[in-house]
Amino acid sequence: MIVQAILAILITHYCISLYRRSKLRHIPTLGYSWPLLSYITAFKYEKHGFKLVEEGYRKFPNKVWKIRTLDEQAGDGWYIIANGTQSVEDISKAPNDQLSSTIFFGSDITTNPYHVNVVRLGMKKNIVLQYHEMYREIRDTLEDSLKLTSTGDGEAQSEKTCPFSRLLTCLPPPSEWVTLPLSQTILEACARVYARLVVGHPHSENPEYTRIFAGAVKHILEGKNLRVYPKFLRPFISRVSIKTHGDIQRLADLIEPLLKAIKREEKKHNGDDWPEKPRNILSWTLDEARRSGVSELPCDIAKRLYLTALSLEGISRTVALALYELSIRPASVYLNDIREEVRTVIEEVARFSPAPNQDALKLYEEQRGWEKIAIDMMHKLDSFVKEVLRYHDNQPVHLGSRVLKDFVFSDGTFIPAGSTLFVNSRGAHMDEELLENADTFNGFRYFKEQDQDQPRALAEQVGARDPLTRTAFAYYTFGYGKHACPGRFTASYIIKTMLARILTDYDFELTESTQVYAETHRFPDESAMEMRFRKKVEE
């Protein structure tokens, strides 16, 4: 009986797969397409996804094609991938009720993804105010994370690996080096910055926020592995093996008194804004929840904050890989030029900054020259970061969308509702017709020397080049068009400010144990990267 039941399930699954595949039969396939044989391709995609996506880009130029994956959350495991600029344009113009990128986050999130408005409106609208908070936390975080002071007993701790959790107890004198696990150190630093943007200072000093937000990256990514399991098993496996539920509950406990305080003040001021109202992500999330008519409970708001923390993975990874790329080459190639640009821009902005009133004098002295406009003027740094994002993109496809209603590309290709659609970013990023020497890292690829001839007035310098936040047909890291990532502006300022401060204040180098892949398109083992830091020695 058991064997018969298993056979019945397999036959039923096979028949359903045949039916669903028939709806996609008109779309060309890379690899096997028959239900059982297609799993061979699916396992190959798990291990060699980049190579297969590049092969599909060459085999089906400017066309739409499909490949079988183990992602059962997709339309029966099939990814439909679009090649070429016209396909990207078609997708970018599709309305949200036809193509939805939020459908992957679960029903309670996707029914009303109001947290997107928090990023798009609250954070972007208040970017100048947020930048001041961001800068101060980055400065303080780096001083704590890379704080090169004496250990108290006078003994140098150089050339020893120092775990982030024990950093303050094993630090060397200023002239010595401290070795850190690069990826984890930068991730925890970014989590501290995000915590300050969420709840503000001094609440963000609670280390629980850093632990939760840094852990969110790991746990949400672990949750993606659930896609290979049948739908009915996912809730059980999630409860047993994924720690997101406990972290979200702990985050809810932390923000509950802060939400109550906001509501008390609102009641006192008859619902109107008041001068001391927090200007942070938590407050904006509460406002958006009300406007959307959804739950204001701490656990529901905590879910949104936790989900948004997933962006820390890309932010911290970019900072770490930028330091890696700077370290594997002589300083004369990129490091010296970018350091000089940072120094020059900060001095220039400080010179042009208006004199503050007495109340703002302390902030002015602390932050002299470190303004949002200064980061906008660091064009070599911007180009370098943009190239890191392109060259080290860890996703072969972008602009993932669930097709909610039947969709037709401009060339007539029909995509049925229920399908999962992506854009072939890897193919475009490596296309020699779009980018010269695309398989080679060129940190100043997006930097144009002729812009140096423009007048030096600050306002005319801003936006003089093609910044990393501007999407293009050959650059899909942040998406494209109206489906582009709304948080890319905040992410950009965190990445560039953190790098600029490190370049200004610290010397750094990779340890001998870190494997280097210079001039070859191979990703380093990010979990094993170690880097030495010391207070910058002036020459």
Task: Label every PLM stretch briefly.
Residues 3-111:
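N-terminal membrane-proximal hinge/A-helix region immediately C-terminal to the signal-anchor transmembrane segment
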Residues 10, 413, 521-539:
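C-terminal helix/juxtamembrane-tail motif
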Residues 46-54, 348-411, 432, 465:
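Conserved cytochrome P450 K-helix E-x-x-R motif and the immediately C-terminal K′/meander segment
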Residues 134-319, 336-337:
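Cytochrome P450 heme-thiolate monooxygenase catalytic core
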Residues 315-341, 486-506:
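Cytochrome P450 catalytic-core helices
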Residues 423-465:
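Conserved cytochrome P450 K-helix/beta-meander segment immediately N-terminal to the heme-binding cysteine loop
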Residues 470-471, 477, 482, 488-524:
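Cytochrome P450 heme-binding "Cys pocket" and the immediately downstream C-terminal segment
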